[in-house]
Amino acid sequence: MDQQVDTNAAIWQSNDIVGTWAAEAAARERNHGAQWLFMADLLPFADQQAFTFADLGAGTGNLSRAILERHPRSAAILADFSDQMIGAGEREMQPFAGRYSYVKFDLSTSEWPAAIPAKVDAIVTSLCVHHLSDERKQGLFRGIFEHLVPGGWSVNYDPVRPTDPVVRSVWQRVGDRYDPEMARKRLHPTPEERARHDNHVRHMIPLTQQLEYLRAAGFEGIDVYWKRLEWVVYGGCRPADAAA
């Protein structure tokens, strides 16, 4: 690992860690692929309908590829702050050349890059919002709302933190059964795995808090569309009659 610290920059701008992340692609697809396809189905577009979506914190593009495959006339803008992730993603996105572009965007700031249009049809996120502070989560949801066309949808797939210690123990017990390797990493982590875990849980918050952030931003149709233990797919839409 390039640095023995666990900030977002040290983790996700590390050549070593991003290399490990890329090498884990098959396991990531096995663990999360069904949810990415489900998110593609949640977007309210016909199979042959043309639309543009932004994928924030896109990493190497797993979610974008699921949407692009499901909706063959869609176009993706993938946003990430890590040159290393973008480099790996460019290689993985090649089957969709001409239908996507990458843009650099640090979600810890409120400044949206000009390469993301003022209005897009949908905005999705996967495995990234939990890395942001509460203040930035709220700010990001407001920014997403502002960048959606009226009727546009936002869908997020992310882990959440339980508020009840009994629930926490159940999640951990069942999660260990589903994925023994994750149990091993928690109980006997390498220095890199410990840094990634600390980074993973630092800003994780309960689901109800995030749904309130969506309501405060102005979304409607808010729901938890899928859930298994700490993993959730939730979202909402900008009202169709909202001023552009």
Question: PLM features: residue spans?
Answer:
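Core SAM-dependent methyltransferase catalytic element
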Residues: 220-244
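A conserved beta-strand element that flanks and buttresses the S-adenosyl-L-methionine
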Residues: 124
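Short conserved loop adjoining the S-adenosyl-L-methionine
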Residues: 109-117
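Short catalytic micro-motifs in class I SAM-dependent methyltransferases
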Residues: 127-128
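A short glycine-rich, Lys/Arg-flanked "PGG" loop and its adjoining helix->strand segment in the class I
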Residues: 138-150
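C-terminal alpha-helical "lid/dimerization" subdomain adjacent to the S-adenosyl-L-methionine
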Residues: 157-217
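Class I SAM-dependent methyltransferase SAM/SAH-binding core
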Residues: 54-56, 60-110
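Conserved class I S-adenosyl-L-methionine
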Residues: 1-47
